[in-house]
Amino acid sequence: MSEKELPWERMSIETLEREYSPSSCVTNYEELVHSYTSESNKISKILKFEKDLIYGISSEEKLDLCLADVDDSPLVIFIHGGYWQLLSKDDCLFPAKDFVDTGISYCSIDYTLAPRAHINEMIEQCIRAVQWLYQSASNYGYDEKKLFLIGSSAGAHLAAMTMLADWKNYDLPADIIKGCTLLSGVYDIRPIVKTYINEPLNLDMQTASMLSPLFKVKQHAADLIISWGENETDEFKRQSIEFEKKWKACGNTSNLMEIKGNNHFDIVFNMMKKDCALRELIIEQIMRVS
């Protein structure tokens, strides 16, 4: 292998597709994904949500907001996964209760899925959501100076790209995002170009490079948490390690954590476990700024 050649560049298509298929490491994929919906349905009956708030220019640009009973609370903005093709904000309400009980408001956002939208459009939608939330803070009582992103899987990719946006182009502070947690993400999306995953995404190598946060890393004020499950493919683990390495090389702060016993699909539930180191890191990150 040459110095510049990456592991995925020498993989067969079969191996590449297995490495970028998180379900290859679990036997109960459908059950785990269904639990997002069932747990979210339970939470939506317990908590009051401001539902289907339009943040952008299309009817699909909506978000749900659950407010903590605290003046000027921090706000966590969650971006769901699903390989840019599946799931919705409604499937990701389940973390809200723990955050709200801790004095942190919670938001779950929708974005238009592939093939109806290209990834670059999804990134712009996530940016618009943050822009709207920043400008709407006084209407809902959270603090626009305490915005935090959390993304899972494809949502981690979108969260990273959103964090790294040139916010001055949107007339917003460069440090609008105070902290970001990335769970089981893909930060160099070139490997998926050759796989079945790309069929609805329609990416080529040049576009994939342009839309990869790995190649956008710069000096940044946000505190970063990068995590993945023990039971994930080597490529998902490598992607997280390489992104954090580049992040730190730019002089930025970060925490890197593999969660023992977890996989790509159940790691998100660690945000709600009181004795979990990931939850402690996230809460500590938020409270340090707040």
Regions found by a protein language model. Give the residues of each.
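Short beta-strand element of the alpha/beta-hydrolase
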Residues: 73-82
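Catalytic nucleophile-loop/oxyanion-hole region of alpha/beta-hydrolase
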Residues: 87-96, 107-146, 272-273
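C-terminal catalytic histidine-bearing segment of alpha/beta-hydrolase fold enzymes
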Residues: 237, 241-244, 248-290
